[in-house]
Amino acid sequence: MEFSTLQYLHGRPVATGVVKAFAEDFFVAEDLGFTPDGEGEHVLVRLRKEGCNTQFVAENLARFARIAGRSVSYAGLKDRHAVTEQWFCLHLPGRDTPDFSQFVLEGCQVLAVARHRKKLRIGTLRGNQFRLVLRHISDSAEVEERLRRVATQGVPNYFGEQRFGRGGNNLQQARRWATDQIRVKERAKRGFYLSAARSALFNLLVSERLAAGCFSRVLAGDALQLTGRGSWFVAREAELSVLQQRLDVGELRITAALPGDGDGGVGGDAAEFERRVLSETADLQALLTRERVDPARRAVLLQPQAMTWSWWDDATVELTFDLPAGSFATSVVRELFCQENSDADLAE
């Protein structure tokens, strides 16, 4: 289940390149997908930051507003080694909006402040807008061809390496927890470890569909998602031909399991496939069941939107694209070239 061993949609690249030679080579801006209400007991703060991770900024905002750390929320984690524009939410019932022009934190700039009625929770984004500068590319012709394929055919919707912690530590700890080698009491760590476990199982399912030649082929019992929506339905044998046509034109997406405490939501051939692939991961599945993690489904294909690129020279390309919330730029870049700086963290 190592990220480096997962299957490729467009074949393993031969070309090499560098991601984030400089922090400004990686820019990501959150798209809330809604306009703040302008009133309410929550204050939304949009920050441009560099050299600061999300939790560090949240802690400093809490101190500035003189509230508990748990009263500051955000929609997702962003890498410190990048330039990011991110929303934070402060719960300030019955209080005036602080003067955020007085908020000083090295590497941070306040861009916007607005009142809102609801708390900003993890995943409550439309998506993220990315601008990457990819350098030291060894074969521009190969990468150009791959860019064209990715723009039209997409990439596997893998969870990126950062989901599993530095050096895969979160997944390692999840395995130790699953086999009762450790006890995990801290809420944040429990969340990180459980997320790593189910993400690894999802990645395995996606990779094995590629290996089996059914990544883009509807199986009887597959859970199919309407493109751009969260709802899904189960494919019936009698409808496979029509459903395959709808998949081929982009109306539908095949999904894979995000395992938890409950039924996987598939039947027939698809259920048998998922059972077989996950047959040697009983310890992680038992952990997710024991901790009552809600099961879910996630599309196996990620299609970047508004994707454009411009070559600065034969070894440098600027790439822009939009991704839905919860998807990873890592999954796009890994289909383009092999990273020379493979430890680079790409924001979610």
Curated annotation (Swiss-Prot):
Pfam families, A to Z: TruD (PF01142)
Supply the gene name.
truD
One GO-annotated biological process of the protein: tRNA pseudouridine synthesis
Q: Which family does it belong to?
A: Belongs to the pseudouridine synthase TruD family.
* HAMAP family in alphabetical order: TruD
Signal peptide coordinates: none
List keywords of the entry alphabetically. Isomerase, tRNA processing
Which positions are catalytic residues?
79 (nucleophile)
The protein's matches in SUPFAM superfamilies, at most eight in alphabetical order, are given as: Pseudouridine synthase
Source organism phylogeny? Bacteria, Pseudomonadati, Pseudomonadota, Gammaproteobacteria, Enterobacterales
Please provide, in alphabetical order, the Gene Ontology terms of the cellular component aspect for this entry. cytosol
The GO terms describing molecular function are: RNA binding; tRNA pseudouridine(13) synthase activity
According to UniProt, the name of this protein is tRNA pseudouridine synthase D
Q: Where does substrate bind?
A: 26, 128, 328
| Organism per entry | Edwardsiella ictaluri (strain 93-146)
Query: What is catalyzed by this enzyme?
Result: uridine(13) in tRNA = pseudouridine(13) in tRNA
Q: Where is the TRUD domain?
A: 154-303
Has keyword tRNA processing? yes
Which EC numbers does the record give? Answer: 5.4.99.27
